[in-house]
Every structure is written in C-alpha cells, then in structure tokens.
C-alpha cells in the first residue's frame, strides 16, 4: 500500500449481543487512511467491541464491511490496523529492534515517517508519547 494513497474502510449494520444484552445495533463507521478517528461514548457502550469487530478479533452477529467501496465477506487482517489504548512495546527495546522483531524493514517506516531517521537507536522509553504511538500504529 502506497503511503500517499487514500483508502476508506466502512462497516455498516453492525449488530452484537451477549446473551440477551444488546451491545451494538445498526452501527455505521467509515474511516479513511491518513486521518485519526475518535469513537466516543460512555463506559460499557460498546466502543472497544466495535474496534475489535473492525479488526477481526471479535465476531459480530451481523456486519457489512467495505474497503474502497468493495464489499468483503471475510476479514482482511492485512488491510486494517488497530491501536489499543495501552502501549505494547517494551521500553528497553530500541526503535530498530522493535522493527526487526516485527519483521518490518527500516526503509518502509521511513517512507511513512521520515522523522524516525534520527531515532533508529533510541530506546522506546526515550521517545515522546506521540512518537511511541506513531511507532505502535506502524507496527
């Protein structure tokens, strides 16, 4: 996927229940690459469930999913990324080591985020909060 291309992921008519408790009903969400989307709501209203459905780690009772307008009946893990609330990269790793551990080439990170060129040997704990979140998003 080219960093400069725009793509749209849509999920529609999302339904999710646990027993008799309806968690999500008729939810629609569209997200575009290169942007940030916030999902807001009270505790327990289904935000995390929606993200897990979007990323394929939770199966909805029903949902429709389109990528760039093309309907998909199966989840495409290679085309969706999800950044969880808590960080997951150990602070003692360097940026370069994290990339190697995930099997990702250094040049690909630089194509998306050129400012990381000066951070190759930097420990994760020394990165700013924003730099850590960018790296976690990339991984």
Residue spans for each PLM region:
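Q-loop/switch helix immediately C-terminal to the Walker
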Residues: 86, 91-106
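ABC ATPase nucleotide-binding domain "signature motif"
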Residues: 127-137
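Helix-to-loop junction immediately C-terminal to a conserved catalytic motif
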Residues: 55
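The feature captures the beta-strand-to-loop junction immediately N-terminal to the Walker
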Residues: 40-42
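Conserved ABC transporter NBD signature motif
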Residues: 62-76
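Conserved structural motif at the start of ABC-family nucleotide-binding domains
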Residues: 9-11, 24-26
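Conserved ABC nucleotide-binding domain
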Residues: 109-128
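ABC nucleotide-binding domain signature
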Residues: 38, 79-87
């Amino acid at each position: 996927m080219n960093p400069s291309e725009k793509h749209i992921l849509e999920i529609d008519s999302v339904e999710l229940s646990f027993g008799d408790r309806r968690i999500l009903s008729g939810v629609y969400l569209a997200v575009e690459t290169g942007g940030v989307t916030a999902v807001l709501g009270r505790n327990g209203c289904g935000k995390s469930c929606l993200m897990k459905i979007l990323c394929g780690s939770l199966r909805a009772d029903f949902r429709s999913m389109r990528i760039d307008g093309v309907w998909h009946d199966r989840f495409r893990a290679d085309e969706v990324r999800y950044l969880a609330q808590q960080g997951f990269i150990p602070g003692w790793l360097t940026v370069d080591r994290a990339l190697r551990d995930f099997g990702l080439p250094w040049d690909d990170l630089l194509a998306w985020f050129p400012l990381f060129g000066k951070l190759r040997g930097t420990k994760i704990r020394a990165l700013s909060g924003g730099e850590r979140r960018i790296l976690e998003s990339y991984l």
